[in-house]
């Protein structure tokens, strides 16, 4: 009997070795878990695949967008109107001058006429444009063989000095700009009336509390009497009244200096100054400054163009009246006064 039991035990051991008999058996629950794990792995793989596909799509879309932007910019550049005048090229171009705020327009004209980039055009323009300002440009056209100027209205002193000479010029309004008033961003004042500004610059109003601001002395910057912007102040604001004599440190030589002075004046926000819109907005924009509304109208291209902004004035293009009808200078003047010229002005802002 014992032999039989030993034989059975030996046989069972052999079977276990060969078949795994007696090993842990898989239950329906564990099978389900393994199946679920496999399914989850498949789902995760699918999700990763989807994410990769989405990323690829996003990359493709981004690439397409970037390409579209570049293409749009290139298209816009190619669609710009081109100023070409027979007789002008990079070896023969006009001598141009004007007000500082008109320098970008003059550069564009030289760039087009010489078919060069802006940097090269700046070198060409430097031969005639010496940044002497509004009054200087009128004198240079009369006496210095300047071909053409684009400038703001000449100051009264210049008109009186050259009163008989202006008959020798052909002067045409070319565009419109606005006289704007700037204060430090820390100044709570948002709007002033023309009367209030006049009273500030005559010295009748001396404290910001008199115009709704916080108590503090008003420090009003001015420019010299022959500058274009001071001329606009006298014409558009002062109404025949004289501006007060500025303190020594309140009188600055250039528009750039005025803007820098107002922006940085002792950090108190008590300063006020003025400029023309194009220069203050496009050429010398400063995050420490803000333009205030006049009669509650903010200066902008639109409000200056339609005249709803109260302080607007033309700027001018002038040549000598003696220019022959077929001269390149006169052809340039005529082109700038045409519809093409208006389009170029709009492109330059």
Please annotate each region the language model reported.
Residues 22-24:
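Bacterial signal peptide processing site
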Residues 28-78:
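Intrinsically disordered, low-complexity serine/threonine-rich repeat tracts
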Residues 7, 26-27:
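Small/flexible residues
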Residues 1-11:
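Bacterial N-terminal signal peptides that target proteins for export
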Residues 2-3, 37, 62, 116:
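Disordered, low-complexity tails and leader-like regions
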Residues 18-20:
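C-terminal motif of bacterial Sec signal peptides marking the signal peptidase cleavage site
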Residues 14-15:
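Repetitive helical segments and hydrophobic/amphipathic motifs
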Residues 42, 66, 70, 74-160, ...:
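Exported/periplasmic ABC-transporter solute-binding proteins
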């Amino acid at each position: 009997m014992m032999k039989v039991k030993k034989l059975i035990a030996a046989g069972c051991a052999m079977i276990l070795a060969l078949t795994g008999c007696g090993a842990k058996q898989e239950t329906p629950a564990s099978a389900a878990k393994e199946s679920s794990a496999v399914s989850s792995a498949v789902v995760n793989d699918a999700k990763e695949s989807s994410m990769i596909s989405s990323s690829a799509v996003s990359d493709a879309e981004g690439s397409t967008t970037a390409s579209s932007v570049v293409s749009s910019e290139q298209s816009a550049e190619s669609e710009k109107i081109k100023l070409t005048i027979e007789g002008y090229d990079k070896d023969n171009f006009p001598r141009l001058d004007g007000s500082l705020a008109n320098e970008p327009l003059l550069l564009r004209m030289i760039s087009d006429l010489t078919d060069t980039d802006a940097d090269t055009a700046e070198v060409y323009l430097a031969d005639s444009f010496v940044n002497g300002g509004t009054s200087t440009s009128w004198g240079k056209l009369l006496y210095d063989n300047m071909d053409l100027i684009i400038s703001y209205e000449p100051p009264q002193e210049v008109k009186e000095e050259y009163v008989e000479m202006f008959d020798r010029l052909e002067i045409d309004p070319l565009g419109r700009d606005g006289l704007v008033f700037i204060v430090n961003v820390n100044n709570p004042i948002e709007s002033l009336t023309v009367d209030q500004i006049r009273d500030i610059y005559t010295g009748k109003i001396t404290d910001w509390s008199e115009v709704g601001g916080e108590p503090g002395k008003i420090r009003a910057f001015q420019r010299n009497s022959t500058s274009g912007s001071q001329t606009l102040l006298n014409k558009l604001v002062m109404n025949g009244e004289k501006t007060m004599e500025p303190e020594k440190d309140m009188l600055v030589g250039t528009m750039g200096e005025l803007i820098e002075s107002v922006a940085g004046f002792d950090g108190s926000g008590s300063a006020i100054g003025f400029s023309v819109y194009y220069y203050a907005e496009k050429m010398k924009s400063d995050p420490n400054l803000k333009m205030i509304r006049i009669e509650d109208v903010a200066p902008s291209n639109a409000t200056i163009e339609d005249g709803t902004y109260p302080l607007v004035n033309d700027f001018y293009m002038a040549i000598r009246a003696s220019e022959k009808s077929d001269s390149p200078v006169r052809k340039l003047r005529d082109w700038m006064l045409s519809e093409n010229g208006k389009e170029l002005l709009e492109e330059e802002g």
